[in-house]
Amino acid sequence: MKKVFILLLITLHPIFPQNIVSDTIIHQVERKETLFSISQKYNINVSDILELNPKLRESRLKRKSNILIPVLESIQESILVKKDSLIKDDNLSRLDSIFVRKRKKDSQLNLSVLLPFRSNSVNYDSIQEVESLFEDRNLYTITLDFYSGILYAIEDLKELNISVNLNVFDTENSLNKLNDISSNDLVRNSDVIIGPLIPRNFETFSNIELLESIPKVFPLSTIPIKIIKGVIQSVTPKKFLRNRMINYLVENLNREDNIVIIADSLNKEIDSKLSEIFPNSIKIKPEFEGYILPELLDSLLVDSLPNKVIVESEIFTLISSVVSQLNSQITSERDVKLYTTYRGNQYDDSSINIKDLGNLAFTYTSISKKMNNDSITKFENRYLNLFGSFPNKDVIRGYDVTKDILLRVLIDKNLNRTTKYDEQSYIESKFLYKKDTLGGLYNSSMFILRHREYDIEEIIEQ
């Protein structure tokens, strides 16, 4: 539901029926079409079209060109507001809508992308070697998929008449190579740089003084980096994900429930913090090689109270063991729920049954929310037509990060000023940037998600 917020000022004043732009669509001009015929087709005024396409005031319509068409939403006469009221619609606060309103004549920018393609180490003449690269998710496949997402975002932005000069560099996952790339004039003349992917490489590159003024986007990892001037940490840092989940646990877990904390030796700090918050909780230490004895877990879960289990680990064997054992403990008399303050990629392993996570109502914070659709979306269909496959999470991440940062740079090259805008949502990610004390920007946005049967739902906090 689209929300309309009305700010009441000094004097009451009736608003008569009018329209606001709630969204936009792209129209491809057909043969013999005029501005008037297009306006009649969409039941809008010619002035509405000119508002979003100012270049048409000075030039004629061209066949097969794309123009923006406003989708108008009526504001009813019965609404009374005060004079000079401010009306704000969710869609009007989106960056693409803001860009359309602030559009400058020159909607071009230079984008440099630094990714570890490692093209010099791949024997492309060997079919077996190339095929083996794509068998599992690895740095090479992540790089290619993320790059595909970047290309898709650039293609998408063409509909807004945005031109991107793309320069791609293979870092070869080498610090020496990064030094060579940093001296390239194309990089030094960039409006924005995406990459490198690897935290160590990114920190080295972001410390190069000559590139300090150019925004550099760290796109994928939650591993902490120094968010110095020019650095854009697009992934919400791990500590913020944890803190948000801790707040959720404090507000939603009953201290009288049977709370069990399972934490490995690498998570002593969060283990201690949770134990302080829930002093009556039961603590379980994993056995050698990250396993929990089934008889121990069985003895600590009860039928008389809800069982709330918090697991803190990034060891796959432990996570897999806990999920499987907890699921087997669920009965009509025994209720078991699972939580974590940080969900790593280990939970994505196919050997962890998603139905088990659903049975446990597994709850956590995340930087992204997977699309839950029974049918192919417009986004997926267009990607399929362009690239011949369905987009995975790395593709979508590449798309989301790229579209957001390019729109920000086009709106205002001083990215600090774009922190005033509302949270921006895309396909699976959202962005709400804040200023770090070291001078850079970090994304503070996240989802609280819960598994339900085979789906994942977002928990909207009131």
Predicted regions and their residues:
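Periplasmic-binding protein-like
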Residues: 186-198, 217-219, 257-264, 304-322, ...
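Extracytoplasmic ligand/sensor domains, especially the bilobed periplasmic-binding protein
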Residues: 194-195, 201-274
